[in-house]
Amino acid sequence: MDWFNTIIFELGGRPVLLIDLLSAMFGLTTVFLAGRNRKSNFYVGYMYTALLFVMFWQKNLYANLILQPISLGINILGQYRWSQPKKSQESASGDLKVSMLSWGQRTFVLALLPTLALLWGWLMSMMGTRWFVGYFPANPLPYLDCCVTVLILTAQTLSALKKWDCWIAWLLVNIANLTLYLKAGLVFMPIVSCLYLVNGIWSLFSWYKLYRHEE
C-alpha cells in the first residue's frame, strides 16, 4: 500500500500524504453527516476507521491502532441504536431521538474520564519502555495522548447513543488536537481541526434544536 504514502501537495514545507488527505475527508464527512442527523454517517465512519487502521499501521502507531476495533464496535452500536430505537426513544420519523445525559450521569462521566485516562496513560507509558520493547515505539507524551483518546472514545459513545452532550466532548477533542498540532508546527492538521471545530459548534446548536423539538 505504498501508494497511500503518495505526496499530494506540500503545505508549510510539510508533505501532505494521500492517506492523510483521505482520512481527513472521511473524518470530516462522518461528523458533518452526524451533525445533520443522517444515519449514513455510520457507513462513512466504517471507511474512516479502516483508513485510520491503515494509517496507524504504516506509521507504527500501535497504541492508536489497537483502539480502532473499539471504534468499530461503537460505530456498529450507533448504527443499531439510531435505526432500532426503543418505542419510548423513537422520534416522529422512527429514528432514535436526541436526548441529554442527566446531571448525575454527567458527574459520573466526569469522574470516570480522568481515571480511564490515567490508567490508559500508564499502560501506554509501559509500552515500548518496559513491555514489548522493539515492537511498540515509546510514546513521549503518553498521558496527554491518552486524555485525548479517552475523550474521543467518550464522544463516539455518546454520539452512538445520540446524546447531545457528545458535541461538548467533540469540541474539547478538537481544541486539544488543534493545540497539539500547532505546538508540533503542523499546518494541514490545524486547518482540519478548525473545520471539525466549526462543525462541532454548528452541530451543538442543531442537536439542541432537535432535542427541544422532540421533547
Which stretches of residues belong to each language-model region?
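Alpha-helical transmembrane segments of integral membrane proteins, especially early/N-terminal helices
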Residues: T30-R38, L67-I74
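Short, hydrophobic transmembrane alpha-helix segments
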Residues: F32-K39, M55-L61
